[in-house]
């Protein structure tokens, strides 16, 4: 009888222990997905998503040509660089920038590292990637070489237009509800490791792959998720049909409207000049969104309206007569 009682006591203790273990297994949570891990790693480190774009004017670069704390990197083609470039500029292909920063220079030796291109847009995109990589002293030169001298200004002179001003709308388009984010599959667990994989991937892709033409957007606005990143008063003046306002400085944060962006549709993003947008395209593409920059921004389709309202419109006034090395 005593043996029987002992058996039942042992049985119930075993069942209770097993039950407790099962309960512990059931509450064990899965690790966060790569998107969440990367986003948590980046937010707070990337200042330009709050509207603080590191864009500097050409005259600041000109004034600091003899300043060894300023390092100029020209990412234009070899032929354009040979035709004329800023004194002491290094000609580095865009796809080699990350390696250049990691192995060829000590970025901390410089107060400012300035990226220069044709229009300021591709330089802004790669400056964005480098800022995301942790290099907080990198800047892009506003308007690119178009603002340095007239024979480099065709990029902007040929692309500032008013073609679609009559097709703008003023209706306020509502954002969708928050959805699920893109899925990243780098195979890494830590935010820094995931970021490194994303940067390696994106530096290998030419910036041209992210350029969208405003004419194509106006012809088929339904084919894109159109984001006008700016201020309410500017949005109300007129925007691309179907465009939704994402407020400058706040709308692309995790706790606001970031997750209203679609994971399965092309995001066509634009700002006033396309240079600010290029920074945002870099950030969103790192996170896995399929994002393109409407080239030259609002200057490509409403340049006169920008001028009338005192906004950031390109004109010959932005072109200087600064010296180059030929």
At which residue positions do the language-model features occur?
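Bacterial Sec-dependent N-terminal signal peptides
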Residues: 1-22
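Rhodanese-like catalytic fold shared by cysteine-dependent sulfurtransferases
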Residues: 20-55, 82-112, 123-209, 235-266, ...
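Short, compositionally biased "basic patch" segments
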Residues: 22-32, 68-81, 223-234
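Extended, small/polar residue-biased N-terminal targeting/export presequences
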Residues: 53-59, 65, 78
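A short acidic-Thr-Gly-centered motif at the start of a beta-strand
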Residues: 60-68, 216-220
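Short hydrophobic beta-strand that contains or immediately precedes a catalytic carboxylate
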Residues: 61, 71-76, 89-92, 224-229, ...
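Structural motif
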Residues: 71, 112-114, 225, 266
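Short, surface-exposed ligand- or partner-binding patches at beta-edge/loop junctions that are enriched
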Residues: 116, 270
């Amino acid at each position: 009888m005593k043996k029987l009682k002992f058996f039942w006591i042992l049985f119930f203790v075993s069942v209770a222990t097993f039950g407790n273990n099962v309960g512990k297994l059931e509450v064990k949570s899965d690790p966060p997905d790569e998107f969440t891990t990367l986003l948590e790693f980046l937010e707070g480190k990337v200042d330009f998503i709050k509207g603080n774009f590191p864009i500097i004017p050409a005259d600041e670069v000109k004034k600091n040509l003899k300043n060894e704390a300023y390092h100029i990197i020209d990412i234009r083609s070899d032929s354009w660089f040979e035709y004329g470039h800023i004194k002491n500029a290094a000609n580095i292909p865009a796809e080699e920038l990350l390696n250049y920063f990691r192995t060829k220079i000590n970025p901390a030796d410089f107060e400012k590292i300035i990226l220069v291109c044709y229009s300021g847009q591709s330089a802004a995109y790669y400056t964005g990637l480098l800022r995301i990589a942790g290099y907080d002293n990198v800047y892009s030169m506003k308007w690119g070489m178009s603002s340095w001298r007239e024979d480099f200004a065709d990029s902007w002179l040929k692309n500032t237009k008013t073609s679609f001003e009559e097709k703008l709308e003023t209706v306020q388009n509502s954002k969708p509800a928050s959805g699920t984010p893109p899925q990243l599959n780098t195979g890494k667990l830590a935010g820094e490791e995931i970021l490194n994989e994303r940067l390696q991937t994106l530096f290998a892709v030419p910036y041209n792959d992210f350029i969208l033409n405003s004419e194509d957007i106006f012809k088929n606005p339904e084919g894109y998720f159109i984001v006008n990143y700016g201020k309410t008063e500017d949005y109300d003046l007129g925007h691309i049909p179907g465009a939704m306002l994402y407020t400058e400085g706040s709308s692309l944060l995790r706790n606001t409207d970031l997750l209203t962006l679609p994971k399965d549709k092309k995001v066509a993003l634009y700002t006033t000049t396309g240079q600010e947008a290029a920074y945002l395209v870099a950030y969103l593409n790192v996170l896995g969104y399929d994002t393109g920059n409407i080239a030259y921004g609002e200057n490509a389709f409403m340049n006169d309206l920008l001028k009338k309202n005192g906004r950031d419109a390109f004109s010959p006034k932005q072109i200087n007569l600064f010296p180059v090395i030929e």
